């Protein structure tokens, strides 16, 4: 009985496939090589011109500021490459700070065509600081203490 019904369905499927319209022109198919942007992510960096409201002079960072940044970020900034990266990041931040965003609405999600349901900003469960601090292995002044990065926490004289 099972073989008969399976064969019956195969015959129906074969008839339906034969009744489908034939694609006569394969040129109507989408050719991804002809698209300017086949994906939403560009394959190469896209150069963007920023308004040049600031001067492009070299940024000078004193040793005390570098020590403070090393202590806060737990990243060693001794190499020239690390300092160059830090300076270029500061210059980039300075450039984007001068971009006019007066008439630009805030972006809550990167999906521009979908609504993002925002919840009310209120405390649902609160006053559990002591309970959360008991879970931590190491605390200092009611803060979690994380393991250090690539430099010791003690300050070294440079």
Swiss-Prot record:
<keyword id="KW-0496">Mitochondrion</keyword>
<dbReference type="GO" id="GO:0005524">
    <property type="term" value="F:ATP binding"/>
</dbReference>
<keyword id="KW-0067">ATP-binding</keyword>
<dbReference type="GO" id="GO:0006450">
    <property type="term" value="P:regulation of translational fidelity"/>
</dbReference>
<comment type="function">
    <text>Allows the formation of correctly charged Gln-tRNA(Gln) through the transamidation of misacylated Glu-tRNA(Gln) in the mitochondria. The reaction takes place in the presence of glutamine and ATP through an activated gamma-phospho-Glu-tRNA(Gln).</text>
</comment>
<keyword id="KW-0547">Nucleotide-binding</keyword>
<dbReference type="InterPro" id="IPR003837">
    <property type="entry name" value="GatC"/>
</dbReference>
<keyword id="KW-0648">Protein biosynthesis</keyword>
<dbReference type="InterPro" id="IPR036113">
    <property type="entry name" value="Asp/Glu-ADT_sf_sub_c"/>
</dbReference>
<dbReference type="GO" id="GO:0070681">
    <property type="term" value="P:glutaminyl-tRNAGln biosynthesis via transamidation"/>
</dbReference>
<dbReference type="GO" id="GO:0050567">
    <property type="term" value="F:glutaminyl-tRNA synthase (glutamine-hydrolyzing) activity"/>
</dbReference>
<protein>
    <recommendedName>
        <fullName>Glutamyl-tRNA(Gln) amidotransferase subunit C, mitochondrial</fullName>
        <ecNumber>6.3.5.-</ecNumber>
    </recommendedName>
</protein>
<dbReference type="GO" id="GO:0030956">
    <property type="term" value="C:glutamyl-tRNA(Gln) amidotransferase complex"/>
</dbReference>
<comment type="similarity">
    <text>Belongs to the GatC family.</text>
</comment>
<keyword id="KW-0436">Ligase</keyword>
<dbReference type="GO" id="GO:0005739">
    <property type="term" value="C:mitochondrion"/>
</dbReference>
<dbReference type="Pfam" id="PF02686">
    <property type="entry name" value="GatC"/>
</dbReference>
<comment type="subunit">
    <text>Subunit of the heterotrimeric GatCAB amidotransferase (AdT) complex, composed of A, B and C subunits.</text>
</comment>
<dbReference type="GO" id="GO:0032543">
    <property type="term" value="P:mitochondrial translation"/>
</dbReference>
């Amino acid at each position: 009985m099972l073989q008969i019904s399976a064969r019956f369905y195969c015959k129906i499927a074969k008839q339906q496939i034969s009744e489908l319209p034939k694609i006569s022109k394969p040129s109507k198919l989408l050719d991804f090589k002809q698209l300017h942007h086949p994906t939403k992510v560009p394959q190469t960096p896209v150069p963007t011109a920023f308004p040049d409201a600031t001067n492009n002079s070299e940024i000078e960072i004193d040793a005390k500021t570098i020590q403070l940044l090393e202590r806060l970020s737990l990243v060693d900034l001794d190499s020239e490459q690390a300092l160059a990266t830090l300076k270029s990041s500061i210059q980039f931040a300075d450039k984007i700070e001068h971009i006019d965003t007066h008439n630009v609405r805030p972006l809550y999600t990167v999906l521009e065509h979908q609504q993002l349901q925002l919840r009310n900003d209120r405390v649902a469960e609160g006053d559990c600081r002591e309970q959360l601090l008991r879970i931590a292995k190491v605390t200092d002044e009611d803060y979690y203490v994380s393991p250090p990065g690539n430099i010791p926490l003690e300050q070294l004289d440079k």
